[in-house]
């Protein structure tokens, strides 16, 4: 039966029937796919210990058959277990949030090689413990929104069109979630308490733009103050869920257990 091979990251797994497992994966070659691992929960040799969430595999698949319409995971070898993530509840929550974002946004068989490399990179860094969980989430969300064509307009106020470098007075800006970009303190002050308008310092906006435009290893070195981190995550998470137009269940878990 025709098939294909590809590096793949496990986004989600679901038990199916008595012994099978359904996997949602982001693959380098085909984008997001759903595949069945037959007898995965019965065999102790074939897929032993490698079908865990966030694992990266070299995988071989059969193309969907006319009868079942299901892609089959034929064989797989672990390339990166990212096991340290699953030993820490907060790491699991962040990785689950990123994975759910990808799983909900990427269409099946829509190749997203840049997104694959982005997700692999942040999972690698999260597993290594070399970077702040929250800073990695800012990096991921900024780059994800850029790839998805959803990144908010941050060069100028969406209302008065004044460029941020030309604004005088208060350094506080607001991310107007419904307008899809920032508004200045003069145009955004009235709705400052709204769930659809989140405060952002001018310095944080510039950090977002730098993270968006530089290469990944350099962007990962960006460090945020505690206040900027909390402000940035509140704004980005609200923006992502609004513009993806869907509930991201893992985000609620993350927000309950997150340690600042």
From Swiss-Prot:
Keyword terms, alphabetized: DNA damage, DNA recombination, DNA repair
InterPro entries attached to this UniProt entry: ARFGAP/RecO, DNA_rep/recomb_RecO_N, NA-bd_OB-fold, RecO, RecO_C
DNA damage among keywords: yes
Pfam families noted in UniProt: RecO_C, RecO_N
GO biological process: DNA recombination; double-strand break repair
Entry GO CC: bacterial nucleoid
Record's function text: Involved in DNA repair and RecF pathway recombination.
Name of the protein described by the UniProt record: DNA repair protein RecO
Organism of provenance: Desulfosudis oleivorans (strain DSM 6200 / JCM 39069 / Hxd3) (Desulfococcus oleovorans)
Organismal lineage: Bacteria, Pseudomonadati, Thermodesulfobacteriota, Desulfobacteria, Desulfobacterales
